[in-house]
């Protein structure tokens, strides 16, 4: 059987060739009609008014059935709907679809602000964004699991939610579940205490998309890891999409079961690095437009230069500046932004950062000791962390070069300068190093 449009065109041509139908009648009744669908041998046809429907019913149905049979060898029955009725049906369907989507979104705990439309793409997240889009188009096929890793406030959660929203937009019936690793753990514990493990399994294994945030917190939780392993297996074997986030690669998560590490690496792991200056400016501009606030480009650049750690701090700074402008009843300028960040103590947490704090964070991050950082060992696994610690000490504290050298076991100030310059230069071309430094800055400037 031809598709309904081809069939309609053939039927319409037959009416046009019918000697018993005048051109005026053809133009008034047939030409103005429009096919909508063909299901179960019923062709739904849209007509201009109830008058047109009555005319078709009284004068044209028999010939329609005859012409349709000529082309299909089947009995096709027309069903007419007026223009107004069609619009009403469309509006009702649209409202129902939106209602279903809203209900689905509420059930999934997705944040309505975190969509692909509101995500600002930059060099540090370009690949992650592309992978997220690909997974949205073909869930469970290309990259499963999809594993985002990087420091806090860089957009991992945003992309995760965007995937969920996109799948629901594609099909409102998609079963999406977003959960933090902590919430998953709590649900699991509660299910055991209340003897509701079957309900727990139904909740997490009967979905099309599972989004789990901050899986590094599964570390040290043996029973939870065991449960998540079986949840992962059930979804993966059913070709359901899994998306995970962490602050580090799977194999860098301490005390994570080897079989989970292995499965987390089955798909695609992508790091998200701190945004560069251009991306930070774009993020601020996007937020200003969303908030309908006018901010000069030079002011946006000033803010972007002040905050270089993560998106969360950028948005926090923007919120502070807008609030300050309202209090002052003044337009936002660079001077006002400077006053706002100073008067609201933005960035004052830097004054609390000390060299010992930096040494402690760096040592834990790279799994070395503070003594190693202060010592003279020349292994690469120690030299790089030592140079990063010196770089951060100069970047995040007001300490003099000699003071920094003293804190690192009596190093000469030229050694500190060399370390700072080396790391600064490498940051421009080494994405992994940029991610590591960004992670440490985020931890030091919560």
From Swiss-Prot:
One of its GO terms (molecular function) is ATP binding. ATP binds at residues 153, 155-157. It is found in: Cytoplasm. Residues 95-105 have a biased composition (Basic and acidic residues). Residues 326-446 are annotated as: Domain IV, binds dsDNA. One of its GO terms (cellular component) is plasma membrane. Residues 109-325 are annotated as: Domain III, AAA+ region. Keywords: ATP-binding, Cytoplasm, DNA replication, DNA-binding, Lipid-binding, Nucleotide-binding. GO terms for biological process: DNA replication initiation; regulation of DNA replication. HAMAP family: DnaA_bact. Oligomerizes as a right-handed, spiral filament on DNA at oriC. Domain I is involved in oligomerization and binding regulators, domain II is flexibile and of varying length in different bacteria, domain III forms the AAA+ region, while domain IV binds dsDNA. Belongs to the DnaA family. This is Chromosomal replication initiator protein DnaA. It comes from Pediococcus pentosaceus (strain ATCC 25745 / CCUG 21536 / LMG 10740 / 183-1w).
């Amino acid at each position: 059987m031809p598709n309904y449009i081809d069939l309609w065109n053939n039927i319409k041509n037959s009416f046009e060739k019918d000697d018993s139908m005048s051109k005026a009648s053809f133009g008034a009744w047939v030409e103005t009609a429009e096919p909508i669908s063909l299901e179960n041998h019923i062709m739904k046809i849209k007509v201009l008014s109830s008058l047109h429907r009555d005319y078709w019913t009284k004068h044209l149905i028999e010939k329609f059935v005859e012409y349709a049979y000529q082309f299909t060898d089947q009995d096709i029955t027309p069903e007419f709907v007026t223009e107004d009725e069609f619009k009403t049906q469309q509006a009702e369907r649209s409202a129902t679809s939106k209602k279903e989507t809203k209900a689905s979104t509420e059930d999934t705990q997705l944040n309505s602000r975190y969509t692909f439309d509101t995500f600002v793409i930059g060099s540090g997240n370009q690949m992650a964004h592309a992978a997220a889009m690909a997974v949205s188009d073909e869930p469970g096929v290309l990259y499963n699991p999809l594993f985002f890793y990087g420091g806090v406030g860089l957009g991992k959660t945003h992309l995760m939610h965007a995937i969920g929203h996109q799948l629901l937009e594609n099909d409102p019936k998609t079963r999406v579940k977003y959960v933090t690793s902590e919430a998953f753990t709590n649900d699991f514990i509660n299910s055991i205490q209340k003897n509701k493990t079957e309900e727990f399994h139904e909740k997490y294994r009967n979905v099309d998309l599972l989004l789990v945030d901050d899986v590094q917190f599964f570390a040290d939780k043996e029973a939870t890891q065991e449960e998540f392993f079986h949840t992962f297996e059930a979804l993966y074997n059913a070709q359901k999409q899994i998306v995970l986030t962490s602050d580090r690669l799977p194999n860098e998560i301490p005390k994570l079961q080897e079989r989970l590490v292995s499965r987390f690496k089955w798909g695609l792991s992508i790091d998200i690095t701190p945004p560069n200056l251009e991306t930070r400016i774009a993020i601020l501009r996007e937020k200003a437009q969303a908030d309908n606030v006018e901010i000069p480009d030079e002011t946006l650049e000033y803010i972007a230069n002040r905050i270089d750690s993560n998106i969360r701090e950028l948005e926090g700074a923007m919120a502070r500046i807008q609030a300050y402008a309202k209090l002052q009843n003044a337009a936002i300028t660079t001077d006002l932004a400077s006053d706002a960040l100073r008067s609201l103590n933005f960035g004052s947490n830097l004054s609390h950062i000390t060299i010992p704090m930096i040494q402690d964070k760096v040592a834990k991050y790279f799994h070395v000791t503070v003594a190693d950082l202060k010592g003279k060992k020349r292994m690469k696994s120690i030299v790089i962390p030592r140079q990063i610690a010196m770089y951060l000490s100069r970047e995040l504290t007001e300490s003099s070069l000699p003071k920094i050298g003293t804190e690192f076991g009596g190093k000469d100030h030229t050694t500190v300068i060399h370390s700072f310059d080396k790391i600064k230069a490498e940051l421009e071309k080494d994405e992994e190093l940029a991610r590591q430094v960004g992670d440490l800055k985020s931890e030091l400037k919560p």
